[in-house]
C-alpha cells in the first residue's frame, strides 16, 4: 500500500470559523433597542421582559434600558429594566 496518497491530495486543511458566542452586554449595562445581549446556541438564557429572541436563539433588546439577569421557574432569564423617564 502507498504511504503517500498521490499528487495534489491532502488530508488536512480543515478548520472552522470562530462563532463569537457569549454574553455581549452584562448585568447593569445600558442598552438601546436592537442591541444584542447574548449570542448562543440553544436557549441557555431565556428572554424576559423587553427582550426578544432571534431564530438562532440570539437575545436582543426590544427597548432601551438596563440589562438584568435573573431566574424564573428554574430558568435563567434576561430582562430589560426601563429607566424611569430620565431621557
UniProtKB/Swiss-Prot annotation:
One of its GO terms (molecular function) is structural constituent of ribosome. One of its GO terms (cellular component) is cytosolic large ribosomal subunit. Keywords: Ribonucleoprotein, Ribosomal protein. One of its GO terms (biological process) is translation. Pfam families: Ribosomal_L27. HAMAP family: Ribosomal_bL27. NCBIfam families: L27. Belongs to the bacterial ribosomal protein bL27 family. This is Large ribosomal subunit protein bL27. The gene is rpmA.
Amino acid at each position: 500500500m502507498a504511504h503517500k496518497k498521490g499528487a495534489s491530495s491532502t488530508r488536512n486543511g480543515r478548520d472552522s470559523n470562530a462563532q463569537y458566542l457569549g454574553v455581549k452586554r452584562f448585568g447593569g449595562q445600558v442598552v438601546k433597542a436592537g442591541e444584542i445581549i447574548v449570542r448562543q446556541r440553544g436557549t441557555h438564557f431565556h428572554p424576559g421582559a423587553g427582550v426578544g429572541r432571534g431564530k438562532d436563539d440570539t437575545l436582543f433588546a426590544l427597548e432601551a434600558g438596563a440589562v438584568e439577569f435573573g431566574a424564573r421557574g428554574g430558568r435563567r432569564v434576561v430582562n430589560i429594566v426601563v429607566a424611569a423617564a430620565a431621557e
